[in-house]
Amino acid sequence: LNSEEEALAKARAEGRPVIVDFWADWCTACKELDKIAWSHPAVREEAARFVAVKLDGSEETPAFQAAYEKYGIVGMPTVIFIDSSGKEHPERVMTAIGPDEMVKKLRAIQ
């Protein structure tokens, strides 16, 4: 998926939660998060029930900027979770975390 709107529409239609990952190619912590957490088998297994979209801020397109402002993002990485009812979960990931912590966060989202 290429946009936050596409992810939300798909999630609504399927009754699934959403992961929106704001990242950039110059962001060291974003790369760490990919390497340490997102690539881990346990995280991938738990994340499979989500509709996921990675929003690339490397070029700061208008679509990225609109989503960035909509969610009040202050830096990257920022990962937000939206539950299956469409509500944003109050806890965000704003640094590189390990797989155990990420699995715990994913399991908290219905």
Question: What label would you give each PLM region?
Answer:
Residues L1-V51, L55-Q110:
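Proteins that catalyze or organize thiol-disulfide redox chemistry
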